[in-house]
Amino acid sequence: MIQILLSTFISFIIIIVSSNDIRSGENDNFNNNKMINNFLTTITTNDTIIIKETESPNDYDFSKEQIESLDKIVYFSSTMGIVGALFIIVSFFLFKAARTFATKMIFFLSLSDLFAAIFYLPYYRDSDIMCNLQGMGLVFFLSSSYLWTMCISISLFMVFFTTIFELNHWFKYFHFICWGIPLFTAIISLIFHAYGKTGSWCFISDPTSIFRLLYYLPLIVVFFINLVVFIAIRWKISQHSNSLVSRVNIIVSFYLIAFSLSQLPTIINSIQNFSDPDNPQFSLFAFQLLLQPLQGFLNCVVYGINEGFINHYVEFFEKYIFRCRCRKSRELKEIESDKTSLLVDYENSDDEEGFDGMDKLIIDDYNRV
């Protein structure tokens, strides 16, 4: 299912971008003349020619210095997001025992976070083709990311409030939602030439267009779904009072905090852009670039740094990295322990029996490694 969606996605990109190139080639002369007329306005007065430079309609919303500041922010947040997402992805492939229903969803969430952070990097704005590619990549993978968080919330709700615990058959519906809806939004926005420069990156350029709503309205809906689900779960587990329930309560709170931190600045910025499109706020764009690409790292902290993954990594390092060191260390500890017991029980046992027991401990230790 995933391979079919991704191949369809790539095919549409190639076809549509190619058709755009053909149309742009036919209109080169017209566009060049229009650009020259917009760029230069000549006014002749008393044999004096005054040349006035006008702004290009494709200019960014901020100054060059502000764009450079936004680039520095996104380099930091995207790098952290990539590292966090890769941690979960590598852990998923490394430990077969950890591939449960929950970790599979977290894996696909991290996959979306990884590519979203990559597409946020400012390497795609030098040409129309690259700008369209960045816009499509961000729409597709950011939408997929927040839809996967919704699926995780739905799964938690089913576990806490119903008797349905076997959810593997739901995966086909989750894949359809989390890949199909973003694919439709990304392609329809490309067909109608909705992508352009906004802030310091390429996205759906018109903040009041229907295509922006196709992206942000589902995000707002998902935000409130997650909020309601997590409040309901906290209420449910608050009916019980023990250390395990308190721990679950803290974890659920972290889920909501991580999602809110990564998505709330984006929602606020989109509302401001929609209500006042001619007055973009640099601080809101900066907060969006700081936190939204960081989602892979935040999800790593919430979902990846858990007892299961940590135990798997401890076993992995003991088995493959520190095998010799750990084995020798354990041997020395056993020898010291046996020496102590031999000194204490020397009068009640002979040397041969003592050393036989020590050898047996070392052999057993080798068998456990």
UniProtKB/Swiss-Prot annotation:
Pfam families: Dicty_CAR (PF05462). Residues 23-72, 122-146, 195-212, 269-369 are cytoplasmic. GO terms for molecular function: cAMP receptor activity; G protein-coupled receptor activity. GO terms for biological process: adenylate cyclase-activating G protein-coupled receptor signaling pathway; negative regulation of cell growth; signal transduction; sporulation resulting in formation of a cellular spore. Belongs to the G-protein coupled receptor 5 family. This is Cyclic AMP receptor-like protein A. The chain crosses the membrane at residues 5-22, 73-93, 101-121, 147-167, 174-194, 213-233, 248-268. PANTHER family: CYCLIC AMP RECEPTOR-LIKE PROTEIN A (PTHR23112:SF8), G PROTEIN-COUPLED RECEPTOR 157-RELATED (PTHR23112). The gene is crlA. Residues 1-4, 94-100, 168-173, 234-247 are extracellular. Receptor for cAMP which may play a role in prestalk cell differentiation. May act as a negative regulator of cell growth. Keywords: G-protein coupled receptor, Membrane, Receptor, Transducer, Transmembrane, Transmembrane helix. The keyword Transmembrane applies. It comes from Dictyostelium discoideum. One of its GO terms (cellular component) is plasma membrane. It is found in: Membrane. It is a multi-pass membrane protein. Disruption phenotype: Cells grow to a higher cell density than wild-type cells. They also produce large aggregates with delayed anterior tip formation indicating a role in the development of the anterior prestalk cell region.
